[in-house]
């Protein structure tokens, strides 16, 4: 009981920073008043539904605070009150995550009940000194002969799969999750259709793969903020298990949809479109995500694998940027 007290104190609010909504245009919300920093979580009072809508501070413009919500903007009105929690997005961490499916806000969606968490990790990409990352020396066994025999992968290595739709990427992910010689798998499904999520869990992953996996899901019908946060939350959870001394395999499907969500956010807050409509922030955020998790100096190795859905024959600027992030390996498929 007493060990929970420091966490409760840290999450308590002693000062309230309150503003009000000025403009709502599409996904972008502008508020005035109060104090805020980039990344702060705010709660917007929804009078229509008598509830609070969570949002995040993503920018500032003309003296106003720009917000993006984690939920629908339905019911948010001009003049609605906004309260800054002075907190960042945090996810509950612990062994209770094994075999569970959560959304990009860290909330369970599998119907198995809420978490009783006493520890939280902040979702944030922190720069790591490259000299603290030892070279890759140890082989990781995937339990798949075609990979272990012809495409040997080391612990801490990053692998990208560049392929079009319908070639069996999800099937391969399920095979890897069931057979890989790691302690736990963390899988991020970004922008998937709802039907595909259930099919992946039941058909591709199966009971054997699910019991030692954690799924972080943000479907295509959810706001761009959740889709953008999905791989970051998965990375944070993977870092937790790595810190506990476990070997972890992190898989993401897909980086393209992560970049598309980042593009939606960038365009909504006024970033200029550049190559193929992508905004400059994408080319700053992609390297942070790709380089976020590797082998630590004192931690167990973390095998890192990303999935990028683009045909190799039509590789454009985004694909080239991702390829540069996968300097250690890439798989291609038609």
Residue map of PLM features:
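A near-ubiquitous, low-amplitude feature marking generic local secondary-structure context
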Residues: 4, 12, 84, 133-136, ...
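P-loop NTPase catalytic core
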Residues: 149-150, 156-334
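P-loop NTPase nucleotide-binding/switch module
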Residues: 80-82, 89, 96, 109-158, ...
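Acidic-enriched and Gly/Ser
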Residues: 1-142
């Amino acid at each position: 009981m007493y060990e929970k007290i420091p966490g409760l104190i840290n999450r308590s609010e002693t000062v309230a920073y309150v503003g009000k909504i000025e403009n709502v245009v599409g996904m972008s919300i502008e508020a005035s008043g109060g104090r805020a920093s980039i990344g702060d979580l705010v709660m917007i009072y929804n009078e229509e539904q008598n509830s609070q809508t969570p949002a995040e501070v993503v920018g500032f413009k003309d003296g106003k605070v720009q917000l993006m919500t984690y939920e629908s903007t339905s019911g948010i009105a001009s003049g609605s009150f906004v309260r800054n929690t002075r907190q960042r997005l945090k996810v509950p961490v612990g062994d209770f995550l094994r075999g569970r499916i959560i959304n990009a806000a860290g909330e369970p969606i599998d119907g198995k009940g809420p978490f009783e968490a006493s520890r939280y990790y902040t979702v944030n990409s922190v720069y790591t000194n490259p000299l603290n990352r030892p070279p890759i020396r140890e082989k990781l066994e995937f339990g798949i002969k075609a990979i272990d025999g012809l495409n040997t992968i080391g612990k801490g290595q990053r692998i990208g799969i560049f392929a079009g739709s319908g070639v069996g990427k999800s099937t391969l992910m399920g095979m890897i999750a069931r057979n890989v010689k790691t302690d736990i798998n963390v899988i991020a499904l970004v922008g998937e259709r709802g039907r595909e999520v259930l099919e992946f869990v039941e058909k591709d992953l199966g009971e054997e793969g699910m019991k030692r996996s954690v799924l972080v899901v943000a479907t295509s019908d959810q706001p761009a903020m959740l889709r953008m946060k999905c791989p970051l939350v998965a990375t944070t959870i993977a870092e937790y298990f790595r810190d506990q001394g476990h070997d972890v395999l992190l898989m993401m499907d897909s980086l393209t949809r992560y970049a598309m969500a980042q593009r939606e956010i960038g365009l909504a807050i006024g970033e200029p479109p550049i190559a193929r409509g992508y905004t400059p922030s994408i080319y700053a955020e992609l390297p942070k995500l790709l380089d976020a998790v590797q082998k630590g100096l004192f931690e167990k190795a973390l095998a890192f694998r990303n999935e990028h859905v683009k045909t190799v024959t039509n590789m454009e600027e985004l694909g080239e940027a991702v390829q540069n992030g996968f300097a250690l390996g890439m798989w291609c498929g038609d």
